[in-house]
Structure formats: structure tokens, C-alpha cells
Amino acid sequence: MKPGDKAKRLRIYISSTDKSDHKPLYEKVIYLAREQGIAGATVLKGIMGYGSSSEVYTNKLWEITEKVPLVVEIIDEADKIDLFIKSNKTFFESIGKGHIITVDDTTIIMHGRGKKK
């Protein structure tokens, strides 16, 4: 991707305690994106929020389990994002946890490549 290129940003809103095959759901999504050749993905940790259950989740020192909102953000060319959504639709429909998925258009302003290890 080059500066000025049009792209799409996919956001998946989930909870930090959501699991898939006994592993954190956010990890599953990140590895799915990587396996499918997506340019990049990041997990953003919220400090407070609520979803369809209307239960407010926040980070409190005295709680044993930290249940906070997470956003998995994935950015790539439109066709790659569309394919990622289509090929993982069944997975997202089957996770059995509250979540919302959004997609919007974005423009690449800068894309600095890191060195592969």
C-alpha cells in the first residue's frame, strides 16, 4: 500500500474474556488475518464500555478477571478485507459471544515497512 491508496478498515468489537477453542478470541482473529495475508492488524484495549447486554465493563483493581472491551482493527486493500469478511463469516456467526463488526473506507497517508525478523 502506498500513500494515497484507498483501503478499508475492519473493526471487530469484542470482550477481553471472549474465547475461541480455549484461547483468547482476539488472538484467533489476529492469526486468521495473518494467515490470510492481511497487511496489518492491531488489538486496542478499552478502559470502559458496554455492548448489547448493557452491562458496563471497566478495569477495576479489585476484580480478579479483567473484562474490558477490545477492538481488533484490520486495515488492507478493499478486496482483501472483503475476502477476509466473506471467508470468516461462518466463524464470526458461530462464536456465541456479543460482538459487532464494522467496516469503513480509509486512505493510506503513510505506510512505513518494518524489517521482518
What are these regions (language model features)?
Residues 1-117:
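Positively charged, small/polar-rich N-terminal and surface patches that mediate targeting and assembly
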